[in-house]
């Protein structure tokens, strides 16, 4: 049976590698969006080796004391999350989930000895994300839905704003289960108002379909909707696919045809790279970014042929199709363009070595088949015997991950030497800025003090008091 599993996390911060999920909620539906079974919602105990970000706690209202009281140890939390997401035939869906929730899931599973990726594709499973469908709907087929605006007049795609504007069920924004109810309400609205667009975007969760659309041989122009384009343009542009990424087979290098390529085509590789990868704020005054980027075929990119623009108010999107056509012809006439672009992206593709195993999900390679079996062995081993499992892995990441897995979940099973090692690790992480630590306890307390003086936080002083107490317990 094919089903959707609509889900959401509330977390201790925005960094999926360093921060932690504190709440998970989900609802399973049929593909027709009829609810199947009861909703799920549970908390995770907060880690003792890292404080939560005070701002995140103010947004969610989840204090570490609540998570500690109601939550599961992370090993059990990960098992329950995986149990839901790995059901055969499941398409997991969220709102900005490909960039946020799924990254938290991958790192959660990685830390807790699951294959971080298998649940995404095995047994007919897939991933989807409603946020770019909402953007696509606003840009191409806005009829039948109320689109809220920000103060500057640009569209807002925040779930709570869309829910309020369209009278969708959402009792408490930034409560995971309430957000899931709002998400399903938005999905039903889009599916009813724009069924053809719904079906089109649903098909794009299969990467082969995306590959078929991105024709690099002819640089066939495609409509692309993404948060990487300004909201003032409806988050929409027309792109030209140029080449497959030389190192990452699942990425296609594309160019934003709204910009004239003539002024950079004669630059050398280094100059082009500087204008692609240098942070915008660090570019010299008057120098603009070159809008070369990649599209990830497994991230459900919001693509459509130019025919989708028929009947669309293109001036509303600040889209000049004639200029896009000219810019494509300029690209097609450029000598050695593809080779040059591939060299630039190849030089920039190497990931720096991770300085800590918890940061090495993407930089450490894939496990062998035997080591994947060892993941199941670790999860099945009684906590008091886990220390014996370290020899099952050749991958150097996993010996340290195993020690932290034991220490965070079952500290009572550590011997005296291991306990001292764990306490030293926690002290270092709480007191010093390292690759793994971006928020020390001093930073945490300083931010609480700052928030106490901010007008917007005056009704949250009791929550800030609880955060202060929690930090003092960690010292």
Regions found by a protein language model. Give the residues of each.
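Short hydrophobic beta-strand that contains or immediately precedes a catalytic carboxylate
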Residues: 6-8, 256
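Metal-dependent phosphoesterase core characteristic of DEDDh/y 3'-5' exonuclease domains
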Residues: 18-24, 28-29, 34-62, 83-195, ...
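Long, charge-rich C-terminal accessory regions
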Residues: 246-427
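Short acidic, Gly/Ser-rich segments with clustered Asp/Glu that frequently serve as metal-coordination loops
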Residues: 10-17
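C-terminal non-catalytic accessory extensions
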Residues: 421-475
């Amino acid at each position: 049976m094919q089903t959707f599993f609509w889900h959401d996390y509330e977390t201790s911060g925005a960094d999926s590698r360093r921060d932690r999920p504190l709440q998970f909620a989900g609802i399973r539906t049929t593909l027709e969006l009829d609810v199947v079974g009861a909703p799920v919602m549970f908390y995770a105990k907060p880690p003792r080796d890292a404080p939560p970000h005070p701002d995140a706690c103010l947004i969610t209202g989840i204090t570490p004391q609540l998570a500690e009281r109601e939550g599961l140890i992370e090993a059990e939390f990960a098992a329950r999350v995986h149990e839901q997401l790995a059901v055969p035939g499941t398409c997991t869906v969220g709102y900005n989930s490909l960039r946020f929730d799924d990254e938290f899931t991958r790192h959660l599973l990685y830390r807790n000895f699951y294959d971080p990726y298998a649940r995404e594709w095995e047994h007919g499973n897939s991933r989807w994300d409603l946020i770019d469908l909402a953007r696509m709907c606003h840009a191409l087929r806005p009829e039948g839905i109320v689109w809220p605006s920000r103060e500057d007049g640009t569209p807002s795609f925040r779930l709570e704003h869309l829910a309020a504007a369209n009278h969708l069920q959402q009792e408490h924004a930034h409560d995971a289960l309430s957000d899931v109810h709002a998400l399903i309400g938005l999905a039903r609205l889009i599916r009813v108002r724009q069924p053809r667009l719904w079906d089109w975007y649903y098909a794009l969760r299969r990467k082969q379909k995306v590959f078929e659309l991105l024709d690099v041989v002819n640089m066939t122009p495609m409509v692309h909707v993404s948060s990487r384009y300004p909201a003032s343009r409806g988050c929409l542009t027309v792109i030209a696919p140029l080449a497959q990424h030389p190192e990452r087979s699942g990425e296609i290098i594309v160019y934003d045809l709204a910009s004239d390529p003539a002024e950079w085509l004669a630059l050398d590789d280094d100059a082009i790279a500087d204008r692609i990868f240098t942070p915008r704020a660090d570019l010299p005054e008057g120098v603009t970014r070159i809008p070369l980027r990649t599209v990830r075929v497994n991230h459900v990119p919001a693509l459509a042929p130019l025919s989708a623009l028929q009947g669309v108010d293109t001036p509303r999107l600040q889209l000049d199709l004639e200029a896009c056509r000219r810019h494509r012809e300029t690209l097609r006439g450029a000598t050695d363009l593809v080779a040059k672009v591939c060299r630039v992206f190849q030089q920039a593709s190497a990931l720096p070595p991770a300085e800590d195993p918890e940061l090495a999900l993407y930089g450490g390679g894939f496990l062998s088949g035997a080591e994947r079996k060892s993941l199941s062995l670790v999860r099945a081993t009684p906590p008091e015997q886990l220390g014996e499992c370290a020899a099952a892995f050749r991958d150097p990441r996993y010996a340290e991950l195993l020690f932290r897995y034991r220490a965070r979940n079952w500290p009572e099973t550590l011997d005296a030497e291991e306990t001292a090692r764990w306490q030293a690790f926690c002290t270092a992480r709480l007191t010093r800025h390292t690759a793994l630590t971006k928020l020390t306890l001093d930073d945490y307390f300083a931010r609480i003090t700052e928030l106490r003086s901010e007008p917007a936080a005056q009704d949250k002083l009791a929550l800030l008091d609880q955060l202060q107490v929690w930090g003092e317990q960690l010292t």
